Structure formats: structure tokens, C-alpha cells
């Protein structure tokens, strides 16, 4: 007990211990050699596990893709799917048989295997690098997948926001700001892909990194054998105009009528290289501001206000122009307030010195990450690769912790004022203008000056301020709107003769083809079956009063509220029974004005010009919170004299959509007895 008392008297646990000197770091350098074609090879031997990893990086000068943006993505998807010497199926089957993997990215490639299979995998890897298989069928398939992915992302607020903010930051003609479109992808030909490969896939700017259970001698012998004949090409160097910051802080707004939350990006350009003296102060300043969970921005917006799941910042460092960006996603109701709070935190780090304790916590975080990374053999190679590609001092990582430890509170404030440009911030907000724009227009700078708002479409083109006021004739009622819709699709008499409708639709979910069969009757019975490869994987059944859903062998009965919601809409044409529906306003749907009809917890949107239903919004409550599901209808076609939509797009989560294409409608079919049990 005496010993414990003395020990307790010697340590003041209310004070953070004074940090000691930065630990001495010894970093083993990889063994290297270079082929005559310019390929630089790095080898890190590690014999703890019988496996090998290979990375190919082509460090080309910055270049754009001009009128064929997306060609590099198509090339990356095609490479590694067979070679000029081995067909696709044989190639992939052999890799799978060996328990290995080979993957390609944009001007990069990766492979991994057990060490005993490394010679064969390197042969297959090298063959794919030197002799890609440019098959028309594969080209068309990969291009189609890219187009489908692009279509699926067009209603994603996050995807559109990212596209616009990078395009505005760097410019649409700059490699970092360019983006593709469906029209551009459609115009890309196989010859463009071949030309891109011939121009930019060169060993002269390439690095090959081999890490694992190998010897330098064996790797050198194998690489010389497999890659010495990789043809060297002179890669063109192109100059681009240097992007500029906005002259004054401003809001750039992108209207997304389907947005349930706003995407915010507060951006300015920076010129920062990893070799600059400011590099270490800057990464620590950013970490304090928003580089982690305990960053100032996240503590404010998430922990204090509860407005978001996360609010962070990042800053780039490299040979080319970079940017600082603070980003978050918030509810529509707090969009303007979130913008103001981010601006406040940027000012705070510029004007209020951070505490020594906060700085030491950030240093400790970077130190811990750095030390843990060194435990991985691949880190040695990655550091050596970065020294080469970023023109760093050979001892950059040897001195990493020393440089980090030398950063002072004064350094943090100095670089915050230099790199977080309060007066030149581009604040890109992508959201639902009808709910957030008035609040954004009322924001002033922290000094009380007006904050200009500019408007852009989904492709970063400047447009006029959107309008949301849609005049509704005083004589228009819910009954008028519904009757117009009924007449537009076939007329009341024809619709009343429909006793049941069955539709069959196809869709793709996470790359897997699915089929959906849906049946509804005038007795408010409902059946949905989702099938994959002919097997039912999900099912919903409602007999008019009660029902259930089942998936993966698990059955869950509908509760009272779920049953009531299904009963309300489980009709071939619920509008025929919508006695209590009311006209609640008008909104733009896909840029066109539509009347909004409320029927219980469901809203129907009808195009003012065509009268057709273009959107259904169902609101449900779960765990005390309301959420809405939007389903868009389009491509109406005639079936047995009735106009029905052949395409529906359902927003299943923010940024996620399920698109179904109806292959057939069957009206008044004979139904199996007991199918709704």
C-alpha cells in the first residue's frame, strides 16, 4: 500500500503526458532493377506466408480523354478477360483453378496467387498486359454495362453532386473535371479503345511491384522473360490551363427534385506537393478540421447538432493541381444551417489557435497509422513507389515521424490561412430546390455580406434560377385530375371491366438478373414473386385483409399498418376507388409540372400535359420515423386497349435505384385457386 501511494503521488493523471521524441524509423528499401524498355521493378521479399502480390502502375503524365471520355474505363474492363493468345473462358478458368486473381484498373493492374503458382500467374498477367484481347463482343458488353451504370446514377444526388463539383472546380475540359455521358459512351468505338491502349499503356512510365514469398533472383529472371518484349512507346505530354479558384465565396446550386437530403461540398483549389515544407502542417490541419470522427466539422454537425451521419474534409497533395473539400450529406431542412456551420469551422481554424492537446492527438493518430502500416510488407513497396512517382527525398519516410513531430500550433494556423481559403470557397449544394433554395439564398458571409448563388444543371452548365411556383386553375380538383388520367389510359368503362392484372418484368440488382411477377385484383388481393434463375427468392402475398412476405425461408406477417397500406393501393386501378383523394398542389417531376393527389399516405403525381401518372410516393413509418419511397413510371404502351407503363424506377435508398422493364401485361387471366393464401 505504501508503494501504491508513492506511485500515485508521482503521476498527475489530470495532465496529458509530454510526448517523447519521435521514434527512430528504419525502413527497408525494396530491391530494384529496370528493363531496357523502361519498366522499373521493385521486389520486397517476405517469406512468412506462401503468397505473392503483384501491382503494375503506369505513371503517365496527366492527360484527358476529350470526346471519348470513358474509353479508359472500357479498356480496364476488357483487359484481363482473355488475351490474343488465350480465349476469355480458358483464361479465367485457369486463374480460378489456381486460386489466384488478376484485375485491371485505369492504367494499373493487380495479381495475387500462392507462391508456387506465381510463375504461371506472372505469365498470364504479362500476356494480358502485352496482348489484350480486343473482341467486339466483349467491347459491346462492357460498354453496355457502363451505360447502364451511368443511367442508374442519374437520379443519385451523391453521384450528380460529385460530377458537378469536380467539373466546376477543375473545368469540364480539364482531365480532373471531365466526365462522360450516355451520348459520349454510345459514340466510343473499339478502335478508340485500341488507340488508347497503344498510346498510354507503355512500360516507359511503368512500375511493377512484387511482394511476398519470392526471391529477387527468381523475380528478375521471370520478369525479364515475360515483360522484356513489352513494346516501349513515347507517351504524349499535354499541357492544360491551370484551374482557378472562384473570385469570391459563392454557392453553386444544382436542383435535384428527387433529393431527400442535400449533398454539400465546400471547395477551394490548392497547390501542394508531398515534397513541400507545408505538407506535414497541412495534413495535420486538415485532420483537426475534418479529417476524422473527432474533426471540428464532424463534432459540430454530427455530435452537437445531429444533422448528419458524418461531415469530413480532405486535401490533396501531388504533382498536379489539387483541392481542399469539406463534404457532408444533410436533411433538406438544415441545408442552409449546415453550410453556415462549415464556414464557421473553417474560420475558426484560421483565426483561433488550436490547443497543444488537440495537435498532439492528431500527431498521435498519424503516428499510429504510420507505424501500423509498416507492419505490412506491401507498405515498403508502396512507400518506395511514392518516393519515385512523387519526386520525394529518398529519406522522406525515414524522416516522416520527425517531420510530423516538428509541426507547431503556429504552423497549423499559418497553413490554415493559406490553404483553407475562406474568401474563395466554392460551395456546391445539390438538393431539392423547392425545399432548400430559399434558405440558401438568405445566407450571408460571416461578415454579413451577401453570398451570391449561381445555378447549374446536372452536367455543370450554368442555368437560370429554377422556379417552383406552378399555377393551378381554381377549377381544377382531384376528381378532374383523376378523370383525365382515367380517360388518358383507356376510359372508365374499359378500366371497370378489369378484374385482375398480371405483369412480368425484368430487372438487374447488383449485377444479377431478376424477374418480377405481380398480380393485383379488384378484391384487393396482391401477389409479388421475385425470381432468380427460375427460383422464387422473395414473395409478398395479401389476401385482401392480411398477408406476409417471405425471403430465404423466413416468413414475416404484415402488421396492421402494413396491411392497411397495401389494402389501400392493391387494386388494378386504385384511382377508381379514390373517393377521399385530394388535390394538394403541383410539383415538377423530371422537369415537367405535375398535379399532386393525396390518397391516404400515398401521393400520385400526374403530368399536366399528358394526364398520365408519372410518380407514386408512398410514405411509411418505421421506428418512429417517416420515410418515403418514390416510384417513377414512364414508357406507356397499349395493352388490350389500355395504356400502361412499361418502365418503373424505384428509389430503394439514397443513391440506389431499381429499374424494372415490363415485358408483358395479362388482363383478366384465370388465376390459380389459393394463390393468395
Go through each PLM region and give its residues.
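An aromatic/glycine/proline-enriched structural segment found at the starts
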Residues: 10-20, 207-272, 431, 438-466
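Acidic/histidine-enriched segments that form metal/cofactor-coordinating
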Residues: 11-18, 83, 92-196, 242, ...
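Histidine-acidic residue clusters that define the catalytic metal-binding segment
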Residues: 14-31, 167-206, 238-243, 272-274, ...
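M16/MPP (pitrilysin/insulinase) zinc-metallopeptidase core fold and M16-derived inactive scaffolds
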Residues: 53-115, 175-179, 291-307, 320
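M16/insulysin-pitrilysin zinc metalloprotease superfamily fold
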Residues: 82-85, 113-143, 273, 292, ...
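Flexible, processing/modification-adjacent segments and terminal tails
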Residues: 184, 473-480, 486-487, 541-602, ...
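N-terminal mature ectodomain segment of secretory-pathway/periplasmic proteins
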Residues: 476-555, 580-585
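Gly/Pro-enriched, hydrophobic low-complexity segments
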Residues: 536, 592-677
Amino acid at each position: 500500500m505504501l508503494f501504491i501511494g508513492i506511485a500515485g503521488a508521482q503521476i498527475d493523471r489530470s495532465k496529458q503526458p509530454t510526448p517523447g521524441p519521435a521514434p527512430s524509423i528504419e525502413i527497408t528499401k525494396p530491391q530494384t532493377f529496370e528493363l531496357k524498355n523502361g519498366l522499373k521493378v521493385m521486389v520486397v521479399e517476405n517469406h512468412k506466408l506462401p503468397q505473392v502480390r503483384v501491382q503494375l502502375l503506369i505513371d503517365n503524365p496527366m492527360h484527358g480523354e476529350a470526346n471519348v471520355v470513358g474509353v479508359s474505363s472500357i479498356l480496364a474492363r476488357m483487359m484481363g478477360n482473355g488475351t490474343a493468345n488465350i480465349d476469355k473462358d480458358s483464361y479465367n478458368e485457369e486463374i480460378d483453378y489456381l486460386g489466384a486473381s488478376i484485375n485491371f484498373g485505369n492504367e494499373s493492374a493487380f495479381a495475387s496467387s500462392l507462391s508456387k503458382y506465381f510463375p504461371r500467374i506472372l505469365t498470364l498477367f504479362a500476356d494480358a498486359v502485352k496482348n489484350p484481347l480486343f473482341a467486339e463482343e466483349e467491347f459491346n458488353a462492357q460498354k453496355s454495362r457502363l451505360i447502364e451504370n451511368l443511367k442508374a446514377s442519374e437520379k443519385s444526388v451523391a453521384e450528380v453532386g460529385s460530377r458537378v463539383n469536380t467539373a466546376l472546380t477543375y473545368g469540364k475540359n480539364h482531365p480532373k473535371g471531365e466526365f462522360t455521358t450516355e451520348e459520349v459512351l454510345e459514340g466510343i468505338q473499339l478502335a478508340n479503345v485500341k488507340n488508347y491502349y497503344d498510346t498510354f499503356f507503355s512500360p516507359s512510365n511503368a512500375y511493377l511491384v512484387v511482394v511476398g514469398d519470392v526471391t529477387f533472383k527468381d523475380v528478375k529472371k521471370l520478369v525479364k522473360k515475360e515483360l522484356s518484349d513489352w513494346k516501349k512507346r513515347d507517351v504524349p505530354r499535354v499541357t492544360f490551363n491551370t484551374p482557378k479558384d472562384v473570385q469570391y465565396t459563392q454557392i453553386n446550386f444544382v436542383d435535384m427534385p428527387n433529393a431527400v437530403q442535400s449533398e454539400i461540398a465546400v471547395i477551394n483549389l490548392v497547390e501542394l506537393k508531398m515534397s513541400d515544407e507545408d505538407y506535414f502542417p497541412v495534413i495535420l490541419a486538415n485532420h483537426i478540421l475534418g479529417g476524422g470522427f473527432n474533426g471540428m466539422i464532424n463534432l459540430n454537425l454530427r455530435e452537437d447538432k445531429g444533422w448528419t451521419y458524418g461531415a469530413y474534409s480532405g486535401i490533396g497533395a501531388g504533382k498536379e493541381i489539387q483541392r481542399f473539400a469539406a463534404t457532408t450529406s444533410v436533411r433538406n431542412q438544415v441545408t442552409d444551417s449546415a453550410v453556415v456551420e462549415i464556414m464557421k469551422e473553417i474560420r475558426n481554424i484560421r483565426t483561433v489557435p488550436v490547443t497543444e492537446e488537440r495537435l498532439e492527438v492528431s500527431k498521435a493518430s498519424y503516428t499510429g497509422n504510420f507505424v501500423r502500416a509498416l507492419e505490412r510488407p506491401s507498405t515498403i513497396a508502396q512507400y518506395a513507389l511514392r518516393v519515385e512517382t512523387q519526386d520525394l527525398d529518398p529519406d522522406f519516410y525515414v524522416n516522416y515521424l520527425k517531420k510530423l513531430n516538428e509541426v507547431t500550433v503556429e504552423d497549423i494556423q499559418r497553413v490554415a490561412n493559406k490553404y483553407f481559403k475562406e474568401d474563395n470557397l466554392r460551395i456546391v449544394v445539390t438538393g431539392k430546390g423547392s425545399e432548400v433554395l430559399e434558405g440558401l439564398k438568405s445566407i450571408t458571409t460571416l461578415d454579413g455580406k451577401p453570398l451570391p448563388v449561381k445555378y447549374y444543371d446536372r452536367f455543370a452548365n450554368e442555368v437560370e434560377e429554377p422556379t417552383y411556383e406552378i399555377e393551378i386553375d381554381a377549377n381544377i380538383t382531384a376528381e378532374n385530375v383523376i378523370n383525365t388520367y382515367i380517360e388518358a389510359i383507356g376510359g372508365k368503362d374499359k378500366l371497370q371491366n378489369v378484374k385482375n392484372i398480371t405483369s412480368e418484368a425484368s430487372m438487374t440488382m447488383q449485377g444479377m438478373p431478376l424477374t418480377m411477377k405481380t398480380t393485383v385484383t379488384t378484391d384487393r388481393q396482391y401477389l409479388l414473386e421475385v425470381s432468380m434463375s427460375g427460383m422464387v427468392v422473395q414473395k409478398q402475398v395479401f389476401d385482401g385483409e392480411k398477408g406476409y412476405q417471405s425471403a430465404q425461408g423466413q416468413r414475416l406477417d404484415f402488421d396492421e399498418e402494413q396491411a392497411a397500406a397495401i389494402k389501400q393501393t392493391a387494386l388494378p386501378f386504385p384511382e377508381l376507388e379514390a373517393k377521399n383523394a385530394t388535390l394538394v398542389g403541383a410539383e415538377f417531376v423530371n422537369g415537367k409540372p405535375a398535379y399532386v393527389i393525396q390518397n391516404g399516405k400515398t401521393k400520385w403525381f400526374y403530368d399536366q400535359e399528358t394526364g398520365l401518372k408519372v410518380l407514386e410516393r408512398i410514405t411509411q413509418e418505421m421506428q418512429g420515423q417517416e420515410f418515403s419511397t418514390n416510384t417513377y413510371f414512364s414508357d406507356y404502351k397499349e395493352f388490350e386497349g389500355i395504356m400502361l407503363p412499361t418502365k418503373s424506377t424505384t428509389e430503394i435508398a439514397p443513391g440506389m435505384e431499381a429499374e424494372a422493364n415490363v415485358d408483358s401485361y395479362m388482363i383478366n387471366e384465370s388465376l390459380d385457386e389459393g394463390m393468395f393464401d
